[in-house]
């Protein structure tokens, strides 16, 4: 294997909406997050987003467009010793239903003013708010650090 420079990890987060509410999953520690995770080797941002939603919520989705690319340490706590690029992706549900699994114990759709306790290392209130705005703006240009 070729050696090289240390590069950032990629993390995808799916923004899925229904009736002006965003889908969040409940983690084993009782906090809630947008669906997503590390981009696996041989996966693209798009395919990984679709895969993570299926694994964590049992839903089949289309990844529609990129909302933002965030440097994790600028937006989430606690800081990591390595760099992470978080990719927020707007998705549309095609089918499926939630089943509890090894990663998540529940799911629900929440309005911006009734969010449950968040897993702030994965997503912040501001990031979720950004997804609400991006969803409603047809000409959203995307945010990036």
Place the predicted regions along the sequence by residue:
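Charged linear interaction tracts used for macromolecular binding and regulation
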Residues: 12-13, 22-42, 46, 50, ...
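Short linear capping/connector segments at secondary-structure termini
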Residues: 1, 29-30, 103-105
């Amino acid at each position: 294997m070729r050696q090289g420079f240390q590069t950032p990890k990629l993390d995808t987060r799916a923004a899925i909406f229904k009736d002006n509410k965003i889908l969040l999953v409940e983690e084993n520690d009782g906090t809630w997050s947008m669906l997503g995770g590390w981009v696996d080797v041989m996966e693209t941002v798009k395919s990984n987003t679709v895969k993570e939603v299926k694994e964590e919520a049992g839903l089949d989705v289309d990844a529609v467009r990129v909302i933002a690319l965030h440097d994790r340490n600028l937006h989430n706590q606690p800081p990591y010793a390595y760099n992470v690029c978080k990719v927020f992706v707007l998705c549309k549900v095609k089918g499926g239903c939630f089943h509890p699994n090894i990663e998540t114990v529940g799911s629900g759709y929440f309005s911006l003013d009734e969010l449950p306790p968040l897993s702030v290392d994965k997503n912040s209130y501001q990031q979720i708010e950004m997804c609400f705005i991006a969803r409603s703006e047809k000409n959203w240009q995307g945010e990036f650090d």
